[in-house]
Amino acid sequence: MNMNHHDKLQRFLFDGAPVRGALVRLDGAWQQVLARRAYPQALKTVLGEMMAASVLMAANLKFDGSLILQIHGTGALKLAVVECNNDRTVRATAKWDGDLDGKPLKALLGEGGKFVLTLEPRLDKNQTWQGIVALEGDSVGQMLENYMLRSEQLDTALVLASGDEAAAGMLLQRLPEGHGEAEGWDRVQMLGRTLKAEELLGLGAEDILHRLFHEEQVRVFEQETVSFNCNCSRERVSNMLTMLGGQEVGDVLLEQGSVEIVCDYCNQRYVFDEEDANQLFDYDVVAAAREARH
């Protein structure tokens, strides 16, 4: 495998069919996620496929902000979250309880789970958009295809794969009529679905496109680099504590001596002592908490 293909997004367009597509392979970015928490094997598959899918779905958005995919389950897998920003940075985390390995995805998620897609602008959080649908399908790819069809009315084909070394995916999406012959979509997506997981994980974008679509007219765009990045910061944690309120923070300080927050995505620790809290709220929060108890 050529290192040039590592952590790369490749967008492409068909000249003779109403289809646009993208291929992504995550190596270093995926390893950064795995290095931060010991995920069970079954959860690695889900999280890796979601990570690849988030980059593919964000690839066609003209949008300054982040696309967030969430799967909420009621079984052993409680939550899987992936965020991809328009600068092609990604992060991911998950919560689970109990044994996950050896069970199909539906069993891991339990009954009544839901899929949430959020578009969060970087500057104006009031313009955040969210779509929520029931989980339908036996794989992350099927669930996302169903979401796109129900929520966006977009025919989509997703092939996703995740292993210990890399996570990868290909997205094909039908464009409105007028972008080539109508039956072009059926032909292209059928070809696309012949792509195997080991090919996705083992071949570069150029080889995959040639193998699948050598009889089609494919226009490729410049490759883009994808990387892991967590945008947590002490300032953001401070804002969160401010929203919690001085009384709550004072109570924790009274009981534990400090407030410690650990980022779910990157495991960065943020510790706030009494002096930090007093600066944050502009009054003695511990004295106030002590007084409230008497």
Curated annotation (Swiss-Prot):
Matching Pfam families: HSP33 (PF01430)
Organism superkingdom: Bacteria
Compartment(s) of residence: Cytoplasm
The keyword Cytoplasm belongs to this UniProt entry's keyword annotation: yes
UniProt keyword annotation of Transferase present: no
GO BP annotation list: protein refolding
Signal sequence interval, chain numbering: none
Gene3D superfamilies, sorted: helix hairpin bin (1.10.287.480), Hsp33 domain (3.55.30.10), HSP33 redox switch-like (3.90.1280.10)
Post-translational modification: Under oxidizing conditions two disulfide bonds are formed involving the reactive cysteines. Under reducing conditions zinc is bound to the reactive cysteines and the protein is inactive.
Family classification: Belongs to the HSP33 family.
HAMAP family cross-referenced by the UniProt entry: HslO
Identification of the protein by name: 33 kDa chaperonin
Species this chain originates from: Chromobacterium violaceum (strain ATCC 12472 / DSM 30191 / JCM 1249 / CCUG 213 / NBRC 12614 / NCIMB 9131 / NCTC 9757 / MK)
